[in-house]
């Protein structure tokens, strides 16, 4: 029997890691991955429904993939939906989407091959759902089949979240925070380095409390030091660390470990204390200001990325003005803005004074305009500097390549456009002198024979 499988992964980088693990399990059990869904016997869609837009994309993708069940279009004998969508809506799922043959929940990924076998055996409407607080399955990470470029990979260090933000459905779908064992993470990172991974990007719903559940205290600093010692890794990058739980020990490890990029993604969500309180956040403007100051004191060259939500229920003109002032004051190096999404089943969805969509979008545009000016000024300061750049590809134009510095995360931050008379290859580290700056990107030329001082 043919056992070809096609995979579509939606949503965040954490979802991508889950997809890579599932694909590895399927291959271990005799399935062959194909890029063309029309050739697949089984199609898996790993879904996201964190916000309304993600939910709509997931449903559209499922319906798009279902067309391959038509013999005139494809060979699909089973459509499996994995991840958040099935976990969140499992009771009504098959009534709403009868095209789907099985759902696999957020803690049941290790059963993906078993489910695929059942579908090929003729079973219908299979549900594989476990408790959302199920302990992490540590052994499957070594089976991952990377879907990223071969020189970088994400390392998912925990699952779930202990925060109870009033706007967020993640704890309902992913459960409480559960850390992976330290030694398992080091083993997986070592295997990734042996496969050629040079940049390791650490992710979780909340990375800053890693280890607290297993070891009685946050152990992110210990993990960073252990990863720093792995031969072959060049850059280690930290995402999704929250200011209220980011420890002095972690900051010290970031500053002292030479492979750890002076970069942090630290979502603050808002800059007004009253809004933060309504959001259920445990931070404050003062705490955020102090934590940013500590990071910049320890690492003057650090790039701090953050994320904001505008248009939260009850956000007044005064509160929004306070947010604008805070963004102008803090001058975050990288910043993204979401318009608040009213999510069914959350506390915030039932709050009074919901903000009109038009107002949300206006406020989002205002913050992004402020950040654009900040980013352009920061980019201008890079002109004349000599930076290490990781090459990611080549433009159609002759001798123009693109890459990233230590201050830029893959897929979300700016690029450096590099001129070189010699051919450069994805995964190369090159030295570049910056000659021009855009609003978010840099332009420069390769410099040969330059050595960075320790």
Language-model features and meaning:
Residues 5, 42-43, 153, 200, ...:
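Conserved beta-strand core positions
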Residues 8, 82, 203-205, 239-241, ...:
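Generic beta-strand/beta-sheet core signal
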Residues 101, 198, 234, 333, ...:
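Short acidic/polar active-site loop segments enriched in Thr and Asp
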Residues 76-81, 88, 194-318, 328:
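Conserved SAM/AdoMet-binding glycine-rich loop
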Residues 12, 211-232, 278-279, 342-373:
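Radical SAM enzyme [4Fe-4S]-AdoMet core and its adjacent flexible, acidic
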Residues 165, 185, 202, 238, ...:
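Conserved, mostly hydrophobic/aromatic
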Residues 1-210, 249, 264, 285-297, ...:
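Proteins enriched for Cys/Gly/acidic motifs involved in redox and nucleic-acid/cofactor modification
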Residues 350-454:
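Terminal RNA-binding accessory module
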